[in-house]
Amino acid sequence: MPAFPTLDLDGKLGKMDRVVLGWTAVFWLTAMVEGLQVTVPDKKKVAMLFQPTVLRCHFSTSSHQPAVVQWKFKSYCQDRMGESLGMSSPRAQALSKRNLEWDPYLDCLDSRRTVRVVASKQGSTVTLGDFYRGREITIVHDADLQIGKLMWGDSGLYYCIITTPDDLEGKNEDSVELLVLGRTGLLADLLPSFAVEIMPEWVFVGLVILGIFLFFVLVGICWCQCCPHSCCCYVRCPCCPDSCCCPQALYEAGKAAKAGYPPSVSGVPGPYSIPSVPLGGAPSSGMLMDKPHPPPLAPSDSTGGSHSVRKGYRIQADKERDSMKVLYYVEKELAQFDPARRMRGRYNNTISELSSLHDDDSNFRQSYHQMRNKQFPMSGDLESNPDYWSGVMGGNSGTNRGPALEYNKEDRESFRHSQQRSKSEMLSRKNFATGVPAVSMDELAAFADSYGQRSRRANGNSHEARAGSRFERSESRAHGAFYQDGSLDEYYGRGRSREPPGDGERGWTYSPAPARRRPPEDAPLPRLVSRTPGTAPKYDHSYLSSVLERQARPESSSRGGSLETPSKLGAQLGPRSASYYAWSPPTTYKAGASEGEDEDDAADEDALPPYSELELSRGELSRGPSYRGRDLSFHSNSEKRRKKEPAKKPGDFPTRMSLVV
């Protein structure tokens, strides 16, 4: 009978066990490879404050559905500032020594630290947490966290968590430590977002500040220059070069007008005369403020147009306000002021002392001999002549006189006081009678002749009157004594060397200067003075001449009226006697008179001075043909004596100050 196979059955069972175990291992390895895996390449990252950063995160999964990515923030368990400064606690140091894998700053319960969701992404949608809304934070690529600007509170642990619906195996999270640091040892940038390469930042900032300051200063100056009524500057401004310097006078006047008191700096010129314009300066401030209407302006302001108005400052003031009327008037008057017109009118209206002696300027340039025959105008006629006053006050010459204007006496007096007066007008003058002709050129010529004898007085060759004397009217001496008492010796002893004037019939006598005038009782007495200095008085021929003259009168009547007299014979004596004494005074003669009448007349004439008023008037009444012949012979002798004298120099004539009439 056959046997059972036991050993072959055991061998087949062992082979099957090994195959099952192999397939089990393969399946297990496949499951491990296809599970979810999350990794972070950088476990610790350091970033700068206010700088952007990116936290990297990678994951792998076998699921075909999109994964959900989430970033969480967990703060440190302990402050890292103490570790950096070496101020960690002893307990934390002991725990770290016993467990090397434990970190006291990172490993702790979530209840002991701050946990916040930073951002999450599902598909293409990114959602920020409540604490990070408004910041530049997003999730880029698959799971990278990008932060635009880091803040001081961003330091801590950041966890990357990946969730898939059908892949639940594997490691789905990982963490990275972020440490935010600030710059130390360097100054912070003044302009963080602006880089200046050509200069330091502080220099650039300083230049910007200085430029802004200068800009405001320039704006202030331009505003000041364009508005001179509000302030006063003296710097030229490019905005308004025409208003470079505002006038100080207008500025002070404006301040004074606003304050209500007169200005300290007067901008109104003094009164000046303009032809055909009434005299007077600017009206006072009180008169302007009392009137409701604006002040009057110059006539050229309305008729001259824009060309006649001089360029100047215009004050932006209200014309209706009383406080600004004075300032407005002063400003307008200064703009219209013309110095050339003022000087022209001033010299046209002023009549000088010499030019007023003639009617027009052409006569003043005539020769000396032509002017001698021209008589001065009547002083009384000028006072009442309207043509004269119309020419003077109207500024017209004598040749172009218009119709005479009627000026009263008060207007004439005010005109005289307003005109400038020369020094010669200030001196004392003689009061002449009204209606009598003034001194003509003949008297001035005789006065000039007597004035020119100063140089010959010291040599003893002059027999003219003393220098510095002047002519006086015979009317002014009418109240004096006529020397009716006393003998001829006493009279001719006191009166010496007196030459009669060339025009004796005009009623003028020759008197010494006021500085050398004698007392009133002796002033009319002419004296015969020796011309030789340092010598005793010579023999007086006066008495002998008078005796010979008396004897010659009957002889002249018997001869038929001879004109030769002892006085003329005395004048024809030699130059020696003429150098000591002047010729004797002339007397009047009557041709064909009897001896009795001559003796009576001689007795009366001897009792009177030869230069008295009565003697001259008596001579004029009794003047006949014989007297005219004697006068002509006397003038011929005078002309001969003048020809013998040396010619005078032009400088011998008196100056203008000495010709005070």
Curated annotation (Swiss-Prot):
Classification via SUPFAM superfamilies: Immunoglobulin (SSF48726)
Matching PANTHER family: IMMUNOGLOBULIN-LIKE DOMAIN-CONTAINING RECEPTOR 2, TRANSMEMBRANE AND IMMUNOGLOBULIN DOMAIN-CONTAINING PROTEIN
Biased composition (Basic and acidic residues): 410-428, 463-478, 491-506, 628-639
Keyword presence, Nucleotide-binding: no
Tissue and organ distribution: Expressed in epithelial tissues, mainly in liver, kidney and colon.
Annotated TM spans: 202-222
Subcellular location: Endoplasmic reticulum membrane; Cell junction, Tight junction; Nucleus
Topology with respect to the bilayer: Single-pass type I membrane protein
Modified residues (Omega-N-methylarginine): 559
One Gene Ontology term, aspect cellular component: tight junction
Gene label: Ildr2
Function, as annotated: May be involved in ER stress pathways with effects on lipid homeostasis and insulin secretion. With ILDR1 and LSR, involved in the maintain of the epithelial barrier function through the recruitment of MARVELD2/tricellulin to tricellular tight junctions. Also functions as a B7-like protein family member expressed on immune cells and inflamed tissue and with T-cell inhibitory activity. In the inner ear, may regulate alternative pre-mRNA splicing via binding to TRA2A, TRA2B and SRSF1.
Subunit structure comment from the entry: Interacts with MARVELD2 and OCLN. Interacts with P4HB and HSPA5; the interaction with HSPA5 stabilizes ILDR2 expression. Interacts (via C-terminus) with TRA2A, TRA2B and SRSF1.
Modification type Phosphoserine: residues: 487, 594
Ranges where the Ig-like V-type domain occurs: 36-177
Region (Disordered): 288-310, 410-429, 453-661
Disruption-associated phenotype: Steatotic liver with increased hepatic and circulating triglycerides and total cholesterol. Shows reduced expression of genes mediating synthesis and oxidation of hepatic lipids.
Biased composition (Acidic residues): 595-607
Ranges in the topological domain labelled Cytoplasmic: 223-661
Disulfide bond entries: 57-160
InterPro entries linked: Ig-like_dom_sf, Ig-like_domain-LISCH7, Ig-like_fold, Ig_sub, LISCH7
BP GO annotations: cell differentiation; homeostasis of number of cells within a tissue; insulin secretion; negative regulation of T cell activation; pancreas development; regulation of RNA splicing; response to glucose
Protein name: Immunoglobulin-like domain-containing receptor 2
